[in-house]
Regions:
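Long, low-complexity, charge-rich intrinsically disordered regions
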Residues: 6, 246-250
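Eukaryote-skewed repeat-based solenoidal scaffolds used as protein-protein interaction platforms
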Residues: 114-125, 129-177
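Short helix-coil junctions and helix-kink-helix linkers
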Residues: 45-53, 134-145, 205-219
Length: 250
């Protein structure tokens, strides 16, 4: 894996409603500084209560929220803009794919944990947290930070409602999939998956069946739709092999 894939960055559990609140502030047209101040005020009674530590839990969580929807990496600004455009006419309960996609694109570590979890679901129907953490450590190195951050991501999965406690004590089961019917949203979500992948490239068949997208049931997408987005390059090597690559931002 390239260096970006080995970077963790995701060092707190981000609740879905916090992302919704962040997005509401973005849609209200607030400046970055005002959004940051508003998040500090809204989270003061939930995280680092009574503390003003510069790198406490509240500040680290706000950093994650800001990086996901406000101060995104330059290479992902067009992706963010397209995601916000897709929000028009959607309700809060329909934002899950957008939050998942941006989080995955900004933090590839999220995709790694999602891939491992999704594969376990396909193999055995459930996923034990210890098995997920062990596999992620095998991929990214035997570091305590890797296991700890994997736990943060799994807790976020639970908070977002994409995994549930199974009958087997301590294991997780997948929640019913979220239907993605709008082809524009489906293409955007697949672009997020491509941009989170090593070298921002993926085989088409692997992409549309990506275990890291296990929370979603995406309506059929064909390679031509990805190419038409203007953000993805589609190269057909043979009848059996089609490669999808993210175009570099201008």
């Amino acid at each position: 894996m390239i260096d970006r894939q080995r970077m963790i960055g995701y060092n707190r559990t981000v609740k879905l409603r916090w992302l919704d609140e962040t997005l509401d502030l973005v849609l209200a047209g607030m400046s970055d500084a005002d959004i940051y101040a508003a998040l500090r005020e809204r989270l003061k009674d939930e995280l680092s209560v009574g503390s003003e530590a510069l790198r406490g839990s509240r500040e680290k969580t706000i950093t994650l929220l800001m990086r996901t929807w406000v101060r995104v990496p330059p290479s992902l600004r067009e992706l963010r803009k397209d995601g916000i455009d897709l929000l028009q006419g959607t309700r809060r309960v329909e934002r899950l794919p957008l939050h998942w996609g941006m989080t995955m694109a900004v933090y590839p570590f999220w995709r790694v944990v999602a891939d491992v979890t999704g594969r376990l679901f396909r193999l055995q129907g459930t996923a034990a947290p210890t098995h997920v953490q062990r596999r992620v450590r095998e991929l990214l190195g035997e570091r305590e930070a890797v296991a700890r951050s994997a736990r943060y991501v799994l807790r976020a999965f639970a908070d977002w409602g994409v995994i549930t406690d199974s009958a087997r004590n301590g294991d997780y089961s997948p929640a019913p999939p979220f239907p993605v019917v709008d082809s524009r949203l489906g293409v955007w979500l697949l672009e997020c998956a491509v941009r989170s992948a090593p070298d921002s490239v993926s085989d088409f068949r692997s992409l549309v069946n990506a275990p890291g997208l296990f929370p979603f049931q995406i309506s059929r997408i064909v390679p031509e739709q990805l190419a038409a987005s203007g953000h993805l390059e589609v190269v057909r090597h043979s009848l059996e092999e089609t490669v999808v690559r993210a175009r570099k931002s201008a």
